[in-house]
Amino acid sequence: MEEYLLSGESSNSGRTRRRIGSIFDRRDAIAHGSAYQKAAALVDLAEDGIGLPEEILEGASFEKAAELYFIFTRFDFLWSLNYLALVVLNFFEKPLWCSKHLAESCNNRDYYYLGELPFLTGAESLIFEGVTLLLLIIHILFPISYEGFNLYWRSLLNRVKVILLLILVADIVVYILFLADFYYLPFRIAPYLRVVFFILNIRELRDSFFILAGMLGTYLNVVALSALFLLFSSWLAYVFFEDTRQGKTTFTSYGTTLYQMFVLFTTSNNPDVWIPAYKDSRWYCLFFVLYVLLGVYFVTNLILAVVYDSFKSELVKQVADKDRLRLRTLKKAFSLIDEANNGHLNEKQCTLLFEELNKYRTLPKISGDDFKSIFSELDDTGDFKINLDEFADLCTAIGLRFQKEDSLPIFEACPNFYHSPASEKLRGFVRGATFEYIIVFVLLVNLVAVIIETTLDIQNNSGQTFWQKVEFTFGWLYVIEMALKVYTYGFENYWRDGQNRFDFVVTWVIVIGETATFVAPDGLTFLSNGEWIRYLLIARMLRLIRLLMHVERYRAFVATFFTLIPSLVPYLGTIFCILCFYCSLGLQIFGGIVNTGNPNLAQTDLAGNDYLLFNFNDYPNGMVTLFNILVMGNWQVWMQSYKELTGTAWTYAYFVSFYLISVLWLLNLIVAFVLEAFQAEVDLEASARCVDGDDKEAKSERRRNVGTKTRSQRVDFLLHHMLRSELTECSNENP
């Protein structure tokens, strides 16, 4: 789950040494117990924000605990895959309503308007749950082995996990009895718990929900004020239109008026709801125009402002807490090295620490040539001594991507051939700008070919076959490009670049796909028609986006886009989890109601708008339906239709609560965050241009100006820039 902050091998660290460190190397180093190794472990903990608790590092069994911890982290990918599998199980699990004694079996998918994903049988579902439960138990309880029970149970998060695990086990036992036909099971809590475990064990998601929990009080206050506005406006509308056509046809009661005015607050039924009044008198439009202006452009934006202000306050607390934890951890590392309590470190001590940091998987490889640069970076006072405040900048300094010499390609094993005049000339050509211009030209020609081939495909023109062959030819040109780059730079250096990784995967899939297309029998439609390879070739056109980075007016927009994607992932993931909760609830409340045999279905707006496929009969359809409601596309159709099908007004509570949480709260939060983050990124881009225009000699002395940041560093840097004034106030209040 972790990755290097700095890719590549250092120039003096040995050409043949593996760039990627081994967990066993770190475990063995820490197990042998020097102060510098413990300090390096603490710095690593400060860098990634996770790892061994500080209390363990002071214990007598630190080495054993660290060894068990590293064994645990070796399976990070497996743990992540298991939590993903827990969520995926919801999509394939057979809904409980299908187990009722139905007139028509759930196997008739058309009858119930079900999706296309297959259902797991009871036995298959139980096996799936059993395997994921076993891995879940191991992941939750294994930390006891290196933390100890007392320290483990002291954590509120661990206690919550254990309690939820016991509830999940009980739910599975009850489900087994249900499969044995002991009784009918109307409700399962497992679908909700799977998503909860997913949230609790994905740190970014967990932090997002903690922020939302801190905002809840402020949000409820502003929602209460909005509710007062809605109640008063609805009462005014009910009284005002009592004796008009509007009152006799639409605003027939206060409850009905309140419902219609609430939907109008979201503009989903505008202007349909006030057409009767408009027919009576054109002047009646003033009432509704004023209501929409106040509701949509004032109250809603007021909610947006309050939500984001509260969000920033909670985010500042979270970022400040992480900074304080980072500082406390670095202080421990500092004290371990400063055994004489001098209050400072000299260059030799820092050098020994950096040598230990070279063994860590989440920290960069630092060469001897870089030690002096980093030491100068930290030594703000210029006294050749590093105090605690200067040492606190260590994680930032060592996280920089210093320019390094490339590691040796494997072809250096044949120096006579690799360094021959022809080879040197070829490699020089590949490194040059001309080669990149040729590739860009090929991409542009490929784009034209794709457009022509796609147009002919739409027209069912036989000339499409020729252009498909042309596209296949382009695929092999990319193979040649990849081979030349690997030959020139070496595979390790080639793999460092994210674009190269994307090209490598797509290119090899194209090669394998083209081969399969030509050798596959005609009966295998998917392989033999070659259509799917075209979409991979189109995906390669995404490389053209990089051209926008060379256009000054677009650079800030493109850079902001790529920075905002990882910044927004936790909040988009939060919305996804909310959708999962509501989807599970929707299946249990509304599952099976929409079916061909329901006589009340034809009179609903679901049937009238041809929305029958958007239902809550299975998990995939439910998620798509909730997405449609999320984007506010005729969302009142589902609310009113399910109210009519269930026969109870309590149905409104489901849809209104979803609107309040997902649309009015979370989507507003994302909109505000994007606006603020974009402005911060534009400021950073402007600052970077100013730095680039400074004295080049000074820039070469401070090598950080030529570095780049990893994704997590960019997000962290962006957040600190966005919250710089609030963080300053927070640090002044809590010195």
From Swiss-Prot:
Pfam family, one: Ion_trans
SMART domains found in the cross-reference section: EFh
Any coiled-coil regions, as ranges: none
Protein location: Membrane
Keywords: Calcium, Calcium channel, Calcium transport, Glycoprotein, Ion channel, Ion transport, Membrane, Plant defense, Repeat, Transmembrane, Transmembrane helix, Transport, Voltage-gated channel
GO annotation terms (biological process): calcium ion transport; defense response
Membrane topology (Cytoplasmic): 1-67, 147-161, 203-208, 308-431, 492-503, 550-560, 676-735
UniProt protein name: Two pore calcium channel protein 1A
Protein's organism: Nicotiana tabacum (Common tobacco)
Protein encoded by which gene: TPC1A
